Amino acid sequence: MQQSFSRRTLLRGAAASALALPLSGLASRRASALGRMEPIVSPYGKIAPVKDMTTGLPLLQLPEGFTYQSFGWTGDLMADGSPTPAAHDGMAVVRSRYVNGAPEITLIRNHENGIDTRLGLIKGAAVYDGAEAIVFEDQDENEATGPLSGGNTALIFADGKFTEARPVLAGTVWNCAGGPMPWGTWLSCEEGKYDFTDAGGKPHGYVFEVSPNAGETSAVPIKAMGRFDHEAVAMDPFTGALFLTEDDRNQAGLYKFIPADTSKKLGALEQGGTLWMAKVAGEDKVDLLTPSMGDSYQLEWVQIDDPDLPPQPFTEAPFEADN
């Protein structure tokens, strides 16, 4: 069954029912873990503090014989001389290759920053929203003034060693999670659906495709993927469909995006597509905040006619979790 609604109508009618739970496997694992009270013995032996090979600090506890090294600390200078941004969040290795006979991998990392004069705009990257004088007041009346400090950096490792970091995306807000694409890029998701147009900025709450190659990131939002508090995204390698999660407390949903351009290459997702939202089949307003172990639900997908519709307030209170 496939119906057609605006995202506003769907959220008002289905609210948290869209957060369908195909997670019974996880629930079963948790139930199994609760029934097993004896701790599992590690095959690697006991753990103890081990010093970081980069800083000399005992940051982790590991079994004997294990080593590690940290990299890309906040404030460390990147290849262009600018400081590494703060608030490291979602990341993934998007490319693995050989360069001059040696293995090289590239990791792209989110920086979940909002508006911050101290941090400033990430320099040297492709910029989506470069407004410098945005004033923002949150629901607790905390005020922030300055440029948008979210974005992405790319980190290069050659022959097992960290070699450099460089800025790749700037002018975004609250880049929380995202997901790697099979063709070697990263989708960076904004977890903030703000509109700074009145301050000379732009609307936010989008997904951006980030390339590991210098100069290839377009900083163009993929508006067809919807404007909401994005969390993560993953692609089904068999069908090419992308599945997106939302982090909006008790008002979140599960989405499916079918790209119009199926060439699976950099920039293809920017050509648009169709966005769908999940709901429990045949039912409205199903409270899924407090499921029982083993619960499962049959889903149906409802098409979102206008994925870029400005966020609308709920006309009814969202479900509240039991305390």
Regions found by a protein language model. Give the residues of each.
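Conserved small-residue
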Residues: 2, 13, 17-323
